[in-house]
Regions:
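General beta-strand structural signal in soluble alpha/beta enzymes
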Residues: 66-68, 244-250, 288
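Nucleotide/phosphate-binding catalytic cleft detector across ATP-hydrolyzing
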Residues: 2-86, 209, 215, 243, ...
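Gly/Thr-rich phosphate-binding beta-strand-loop-beta motif of the actin/hexokinase/Hsp70
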Residues: 78-119, 123-125, 141, 277-290
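Alpha-helical scaffold segments in soluble metabolic enzymes
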Residues: 24, 28, 229, 257-258, ...
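Flexible, glycine-rich phosphate/dinucleotide-binding loops
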Residues: 73, 102, 114, 206, ...
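Glycine-rich phosphate-binding loop and adjoining helix at the ATP-binding site
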Residues: 40, 117, 122-274
Length: 290
């Protein structure tokens, strides 16, 4: 989880630069699947030692893993005895979209791929009740997609008051915390940690202060913030585990997702500098990457 905690490298400017190299390296590997260190250095525009040191840090925390050369020979790499790829099991990210009528939740692995229905069930402890454990949040009532091989997601009706909304969100967060603790208890050395939770809202969002400043479709969300929405006990756990929580406008999240989707799927548009997304819901939103 240290990868997402910028405090670990805030003592020196030269070390801060490595955070950028780490993020860029992960971005490249999520699109290229696997690359050797020489090719990574070339694409990052840095020296081989810089790329190698960055990769070593990411490997040390488990974010990258090596692949034997024979397994990647068709990629044209061929410059090293092994190549590097993102370890999808390093940790998970949760996206929660707050709509006028529905709250939707999806879980992504570290390679930014949505979990299948079966994997989602496993991660969210769907079967904990049968093992004699208390159910923190009954995800089963809200699981979508009938095909086990397709991406699974959770869909919950949006409550109609601030009190019920806050209660529902905290039940969801409680369930995510329970899943995270369950992962650590089952296998601490290989636990798939919860790395971050992102909330996407309609209206106007102050991203830096994690506050919804205006909400036209859900007026009771006006002025709600991370500190007022998430209970103290849940915040304490999230912060103690360095789990990042972010607020963003839903149309902007669509633009960001489109950027990563194009890059991950090696689309000719993946390197486009300008992307526009139009979000059609109860209202109309627009996200821009320029």
């Amino acid at each position: 989880m240290g990868l997402l905690n910028t405090n670990i490298w805030q003592d020196h400017d030269s070390e801060l630069a490595r955070i950028s190299y780490s993020a860029r390296m992960l971005y490249l590997l999520r699109g290229a699947i696997c690359l050797d260190r020489m090719e990574l250095a070339k694409r990052l525009g840095v020296t081989w030692p810089t790329a190698s040191n960055t990769a070593e840090k990411l490997q040390k925390i488990g974010a990258l893993r090596t692949v034997a050369q024979e397994a990647v020979s068709e990629t044209g790499s061929g410059k090293s005895s092994y190549s590097l790829m993102v370890n999808p099991d390093y940790g998970y990210f949760v996206g929660i979209s707050i709509g006028s009528s529905e709250i939707k939740l999806v879980v992504l692995d570290f390679n930014f791929d949505p979990l299948s229905k079966v994997s989602l069930q496993d991660y969210l402890c769907f079967y904990a009740e049968s093992e004699g454990n208390p159910v923190v949040f009954d995800w089963r009532k809200y699981l979508m997609q009938s095909d086990a091989t397709t991406n699974g997601y959770i869909k919950i009706p949006t409550p109609e008051s601030a009190e019920r909304f806050s209660a529902t969100i905290n039940q969801i967060v409680n369930g995510l915390i329970a899943a995270d603790i369950n992962q650590q208890n089952q296998s601490p050395s290989t636990a798939k940690h919860l790395l971050g939770i992102g909330f996407a809202f309609t209206g106007a969002v102050d991203v830096e202060n994690k506050t919804v400043t205006e909400s036209f479709n859900l007026p009771f969300l006006r002025g709600i913030s991370y500190k007022t929405l998430i209970s103290p006990s849940n915040r304490e756990y999230l912060e103690s585990q360095n789990i990042t929580v972010s607020f963003q406008h839903n149309a902007k999240t669509v633009a960001i997702a489109e950027k990563y989707y194009l890059q991950k799927n090696n689309s000719p548009l993946g390197e486009s500098e300008d992307i526009v997304s139009i979000y059609l819901g109860t209202g109309i939103g627009c996200g821009l990457i320029l």
